[in-house]
């Protein structure tokens, strides 16, 4: 699913995002917007969230949204010519010692960088965020009184 970001506008609690000289949001702007909606501090201690690759100063004209950062998603992103991929699940759950192109995850990073595509993920931070994945699912199935399994950190 590809999406062209709308121009940034100030929202409650958020200042205006910066933009490139062409008026596009930057990778850094998109990261800031996602992190404002799903603060990294809400992520589980075992989880990985954030910008995996990409230059925060680069413009973003289109974004591909996906659940997992797998090869088929990278193929679609490259074919569609998007500037950024945002996934729910992380590429790496733990720190990595290498990103060799001989490793499937390393190959993913290499392909994205060569294509000039940034990769951002928001996993448990988005699950736990107010109005996030858990809240949306609860609402969809008709739950009216919900509490988190684990309290917010």
Residues of each region from the PLM?
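Hydrophobic structural segments
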Residues: 1-153
């Amino acid at each position: 699913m590809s999406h062209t970001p709308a121009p940034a506008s100030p929202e409650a609690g958020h200042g205006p995002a910066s933009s490139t000289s062409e008026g596009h949001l930057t990778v850094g702007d998109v990261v800031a917007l996602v992190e404002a909606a799903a603060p990294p501090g809400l992520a589980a201690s075992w989880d990985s969230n954030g910008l995996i690759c990409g230059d925060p100063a680069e413009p973003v004209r289109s974004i591909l949204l996906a659940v997992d950062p797998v090869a088929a998603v990278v193929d679609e992103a490259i074919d569609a010519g998007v500037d950024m991929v945002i996934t729910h699940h992380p590429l790496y759950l733990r720190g990595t010692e290498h990103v060799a192109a001989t490793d499937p995850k390393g190959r993913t990073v290499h392909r994205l960088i060569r294509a000039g595509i940034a990769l951002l993920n928001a996993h448990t931070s988005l699950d736990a965020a107010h109005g996030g994945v858990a809240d949306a699912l609860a609402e969809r199935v008709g739950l009216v009184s919900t509490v988190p399994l684990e309290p917010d950190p």
